[in-house]
Design a protein with these regions (language model features):
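Active-site regions of metal-assisted phosphoester/phosphodiester hydrolases
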Residues: 1-7, 11-23, 72-241
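N-terminal, active-site-proximal structural segment of metallo-dependent hydrolase catalytic domains
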Residues: 1-49, 60, 65, 241
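Short, ordered beta-strand-loop transition motifs
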Residues: 55-63, 82-85
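Catalytic-core segment of enzymes that process non-peptidic bonds
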Residues: 57-59, 65-75
Length: 241
């Protein structure tokens, strides 16, 4: 039976119209697990989903805004602790899959006193999250890391830094994770005819992908000509290989 994992940066879902349009588009995507970034804890993908993990409240935004929320319609989800409760969240889904949601630093942002320049902030944040990935990867459950990586893995540099990309690719390899949304399967690249590339990714345990095939898709962040976000959404559907 197909199983779909999706992630979408909702650009803070700042008004009721955008929230309603986002929910309509998410209903169309029909994912089993959602990792939402720059979202709100009360913005559900649908009535049959439960919020199973969330990052800490943002200190720079409305009380209900979160960098990461994880939703599922699968029974048995529960939150897991992470080393960075501001920009990550983690949940055990059905006891078989750990889902780790992330927002990594964007161009111009800082992290723990590290500047954006020379990808210092990116590398600092990634180093902390990498330890979580490594520990989760040692567990019997499979691992999914998804969210806004703020870094393309495409055939041509799009955003943000070749140095950040090199560190990200190394961290994924060390944790035996595969970015299903990387080149040559980048669905945003395909959606836009090469005008843009994925910076939001769904990464899965290599062992899982040896048993199942993962087909990525992307959708435009709009409904009926109205803009919803500045990020396309992406999803990966897992089926028997």
């Amino acid at each position: 039976m197909p199983f779909r994992i999706a992630t979408w940066n909702l650009e803070r879902a700042a008004n009721a119209r955008r929230r309603a349009d986002a929910q309509h588009r998410m209903a169309e995507m029909d994912a089993d697990v959602w990792v939402l970034t720059e979202s709100r804890r009360d913005l559900s993908p649908g009535t049959d989903y439960r919020l199973v993990a969330e990052s800490a409240p943002r200190d720079d935004a409305d009380a209900d805004e979160r960098w990461v929320t994880i939703w599922t319609r699968v029974e048995g989800g529960s939150p897991r602790a992470t080393r960075d409760d501001q920009f990550t969240a983690c949940a055990s889904i059905g006891g078989l899959l750990n889902v780790y949601g992330t927002v990594l630093p964007w161009r111009g942002s800082t992290c723990r006193g590290h500047p954006s320049a020379n990808a210092e902030a990116y590398i600092a944040a990634l180093s902390v999250q990498h330890e979580d990935w490594r520990e989760l990867g040692d567990e019997p459950a499979e691992l999914c890391v998804a969210g806004d990586f703020n870094q393309d893995l495409s055939v041509r540099s799009y955003y943000w830094s070749l140095k950040a990309r090199a560190y990200l690719e190394c961290a994924l390899r060390e944790c035996d994770l595969v970015a299903t949304t990387a080149a040559p399967n980048d669905p945003v690249w395909q959606l836009t005819g090469g005008e843009a590339a994925c910076i939001d990714h769904v990464c899965l345990s290599a062992g899982l992908l040896r048993r199942l095939s993962g087909a990525p898709i992307a959708w435009r962040p709009e409904r009926d000509g109205r803009n919803i976000s500045d990020h396309p959404g992406v999803a990966v559907t897992l089926t028997e290989a």
